[in-house]
């Protein structure tokens, strides 16, 4: 049996350091928000042939120095939605873009729609994204508060906070773009981390009812080992799928898959070393669980 709790204090100190560092980065360096949140110009483009790839199209727009460029397929395989930071949809500016694009890929495209994404729409989108993340956290925490004792709930809260803050801190450190797909990834991370934590907590509570003579330090270690095969299988299979998306999914999915990879790694780690450490430090015992059962 692996003794996961042998170095739990050391891992706790490392986590505290990383969380504080991430918070400092988020406060003073901030996040690199993409066009979705900063506003810019939106172009709906249709290619008239199948030879031009999305990578060559992206390269052409990046070379125009338009700021952050986001290109996505929608509808048919020849339709693309292009967003970039430069806020100028005047006829002269659009004509220059058309000329540059013609030089790069030829005259085989049509601009079906051109419009500005204003700062008001972007700020509302950012506000909605923040509300979505906060609501998802609140619902998850409400669920675990009902299902488990308050000590377990506190452990889950700290584990979730740890995972989300470290993921955002990583994006801040390396100045990676934050767009709507990253928001979706963060929401998924919340669910994944909570699921991992609940599986171990469920086994801890079950073992607390069965063994009255085993201290919580040993009991959490037993519970982690009993659920280890499930944790490894779930984490490894999820990571393999995400790595495939990151390598072969193209530029559009790189940010999303990277955020998810970080979330899976942090979520697996926190369910073992953060959530369970709270139970150890609060010295949860069989009396705690039985008292709650009687209530």
Model features per residue range: what roles?
Residues 1-295:
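A structural signal for conserved, well-ordered secondary-structure elements
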